[in-house]
Regions:
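Membrane engagement elements in two modes
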Residues: 1-52, 64-66, 71-74, 82-109, ...
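Short, well-ordered beta-strand segments enriched in hydrophobic/aromatic residues
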Residues: 53-61
Length: 150
């Protein structure tokens, strides 16, 4: 079972640490979204090729943001390309079954996982939000590509 406490996944009573890549941060206005990743060879196999990764995404709004900047996450999209060039696109409503609402100074953080058939893959991701002050106004937040390595 996977538990996560303060940035450290705990799996089978072992403590692991996420890799925080300073390049893998999306920023738009008052919104910052850093991504941290971790390869877990303990849950991976060579035959068949099955490489397990977990990741942590933190969505935060500056404490100095105006109240009308409050938003809700509506939609997520990601495109995963493995080392052989195979591509998979996934999209859905919310993230991990939730539609977080974030306002000034607030943080929403979630942990998820993925498996790949090659030792490295890269992911392109974006989220779509709507602002409460103007329901018709939305924002697309794109992430830099981030790479998964075993």
């Amino acid at each position: 079972m996977l538990y996560c406490r303060e940035g450290f996944p705990i799996i089978r009573d072992q403590i692991f640490r996420y890799v925080h890549d300073p390049v893998c941060v999306a920023m738009t206005g008052d919104i910052t979204v850093p991504v941290s990743t971790l390869s877990l060879p303990e849950f991976s196999s060579l035959h068949p090729s099955h490489y397990f990764f977990t990741y942590q995404i933190r969505i935060e709004m500056s404490k100095d943001a105006l109240p009308e900047k409050a938003f809700q996450l509506d939609h997520c999209y990601w495109r995963i390309t493995n080392a052989e060039g195979d591509m998979e696109e996934v999209q859905g409503s919310g993230v991990v079954g939730e539609f977080p609402v974030i306002s000034s100074g607030q943080i929403y953080e979630y942990t998820s996982c993925s498996t790949f058939s090659t030792t490295s893959s890269y992911m392109k991701r974006y989220y779509t939000f709507h602002f409460f002050a103007s329901r018709a106004r939305s924002l697309m937040l794109s992430f830099p590509d981030y790479i998964w390595h075993v």
